[in-house]
Amino acid sequence: MWPPSHRQLCRAFLLVCVFSVISFFLHIHQDSFPHGLGLSILCPDRRLVTPPVAIFCLPGTAMGPNASSSCPQHPASLSGTWTVYPNGRFGNQMGQYATLLALAQLNGRRAFILPAMHAALAPVFRITLPVLAPEVDSRTPWRELQLHDWMSEEYADLGDPFLKLSGFPCSWTFFHHLREQIRREFTLHDHLREEAQSVLGQLRLGRTGDRPRTFVGVHVRRGDYLQVMPQRWKGVVGDSAYLRQAMDWFRARHEAPVFVVTSNGMEWCKENIDTSQGDVTFAGDGQEATPWKDFALLTQCNHTIMTIGTFGFWAAYLAGGDTVYLANFTLPDSEFLKIFKPEAAFLPEWVGINADLSPLWTLAKP
């Protein structure tokens, strides 16, 4: 019997390699996804501003002829698939995104966002979590978990490989250990940052005409909270007395600050905020349909005054610097305190000024 030729040996070796590669991919397909789901990693096409769904790409696949980066990849040590319901408005969804990212990392799971969250956040921020396509979402055997708004021990040891989170988490206790990563995720797109900085660059102090040395962003939440807080939660929103105290706190500590006011109730602000010192400007447009314009302004300021709500929280968290917030804004017996822990909502170094609850005591009298 003739010994095999060199050519035959090469062919045999190539066949073995081909079968090995096929076997490897079949193994990944069977172990990584539930029955019927595809093999590809899902990622958004970042060339689009608001892609409605994910595109499919393999690790290392370029996103386009002009793309310099590849599809975001989860580390090989991560497994499973976690996502979160995109409930609520802009600030709510920022909290859900950050909490999903943090809890998934803590539990060694891969995090994906749903298309609605991508549509809300991607036009504003350079977020990197890949998008879960609707057909994958509908065929995944999810277990659902509603989160409360503070970190708990059980959240550090969740064994479910396919988990869909819900609720309105926006507590620093979930993600503050990843602060720099969260700040990178919520980096503004260049055109929004530049537009906000252009607005701030044109501001002048009213009395002297000088450029301000310090910018203090002021977010005044009104709108639906005017009814929700007193009627449902036995609470108040920030009033003119609170805003005056907060501004005086900054005036005492910073030379020549300017207060950049944004609000979804700008008319009230113009009628009730004292502008006699020439250091207040009403810069926001207050349009709830385009919240990123006001948000970009706030994040480009040095410091923050917030009233209540997740929008103000995130503006302060990303701006850094000093933050003054409205404290004790509900009655002690409010049901709100069952779902909201102030110590988990506001960073320890932030400064709280107590709300005036006298309007609530008046309402409570028979």
Curated annotation (Swiss-Prot):
Coiled coil: none annotated. Pathway: Protein modification; protein glycosylation. The chain crosses the membrane at residues 9-25. Residues 1-8 are cytoplasmic. GO terms for cellular component: Golgi cisterna membrane. GO terms for biological process: carbohydrate metabolic process; fucosylation; lipid metabolic process; olfactory bulb development; positive regulation of cell-matrix adhesion; positive regulation of endothelial cell migration; positive regulation of endothelial cell-matrix adhesion via fibronectin; positive regulation of sprouting angiogenesis. Its EC number is 2.4.1.69, 2.4.1.344. Glycans are attached at residues 66, 302, 328. InterPro entries: Glyco_trans_11. Signal peptide: none annotated. PANTHER family: GALACTOSIDE 2-L-FUCOSYLTRANSFERASE (PTHR11927), GALACTOSIDE ALPHA-(1,2)-FUCOSYLTRANSFERASE 1 (PTHR11927:SF4). This is Galactoside alpha-(1,2)-fucosyltransferase 1. The gene is FUT1.
